[in-house]
Regions:
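Amphipathic alpha-helical "coupling" segments that flank catalytic cores
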Residues: 1-169
Length: 169
């Protein structure tokens, strides 16, 4: 669980932990041997697996220390004698999960500029917090108060730009 954007997610604490741990293990294993999705192929459904991690964390309103989980999972493979050949494993998984979070936010109708602003300060350890900030900002900007604030900002910015241009002449 979950296996898609609209499927059920685990809700009980042990189920949540088990689901996230299992999916982390899957991603570390495949990325560790350089079996990653390409732009056209994802034979092991790794995008769906990453989306499952993201949905489980966000919809249960939890922050996991995913960086620690990724490191620990990688060390478990090493301890069992498996040689993970991918030297950029942590970085690639961080970027992969970041891309999947962007996709998830887009599917939740969060504005592109808000997604980009959120992703610029993204941390795997605060995945839920990152999403929640973007979601709240999206709600504010899309209501009348946000529209008024944005309009006032644009007007003030335009006035300042004109003043700067006139003072340079």
């Amino acid at each position: 669980l979950p296996i898609g954007l609209d499927t059920q997610i685990p809700k009980k604490p042990y189920s949540v932990v088990l689901s996230v741990s299992d999916k982390i293990d899957t991603l570390v294993g495949f990325f560790g041997i350089n079996e990653k999705p390409t732009s056209s192929k994802d034979p092991f459904a790794l995008r769906r697996t990453a989306l499952g991690i993201i949905r489980t964390i966000i919809e249960n309103k939890k922050n996991f220390k995913l960086n620690d989980l990724l490191s620990y999972s990688s060390s478990l493979y090493q301890d069992q004698g498996y040689n993970l050949t991918n030297q950029d494993l942590q970085k690639e998984l961080h970027n992969f999960l970041k891309d999947r979070l962007k996709y998830y936010m887009k599917e939740k109708k969060i504005r592109f500029d808000i997604i980009e602003a959120t992703i610029s300060s993204f941390s795997l350890n605060n995945l839920f917090s990152s999403f929640e900030k973007a979601n709240q900002l999206n709600k504010i900007i899309n209501n009348q108060q946000g529209i008024d604030i944005n309009s006032s900002y644009k007007r003030a910015s335009s006035i300042l730009d004109n003043e700067l241009k006139n003072s340079e002449i």
